[in-house]
Regions:
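Zn2+-dependent cytidine deaminase-like catalytic core
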Residues: 1-86
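Acidic/histidine-enriched, glycine/proline-rich intrinsically disordered or flexible terminal extensions
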Residues: 81-103
Length: 103
């Protein structure tokens, strides 16, 4: 969650920062976590071809759905990403649960 806006995730911020493009096909998006359903929809809507995911242990988002719908998904399950997110969740549970839309 960036700028105090729970809809601004890393994926949406990257997409916005990329600006208007003729096409996003052939684009690789790199994420720390498995994209949530909101971000997964963005990826599919604009035809992003490949997603590289740092880890999907702390949050299991829509990456299976993306793969089932033709997006190449590379799941690293990187220990550094897992540790970073585990620490963040422990230190900032209120922000984490707001970000993922859970009570």
């Amino acid at each position: 969650m960036q700028d105090g806006d729970p809809s601004v995730h890393g994926e949406t911020a990257a997409f916005k920062n990329a600006g208007r493009q003729r096409s996003y096909r052939g684009t690789t998006m790199v994420t720390t976590l498995s994209p949530c359903w909101f971000c997964s929809g963005l990826i599919r809507q604009f035809g992003i071809s490949r997603v590289v995911i740092g880890e999907a242990q702390t949050f299991y988002g829509g990456h299976d759905w993306l793969a089932e719908n033709g997006v190449e998904v590379v799941l690293l399950d990187d220990p550094e990403c897992i540790e970073m997110m585990t620490r963040f969740i422990a230190e900032q549970p209120e922000i984490w649960f707001e970000d993922i839309g859970q009570d």
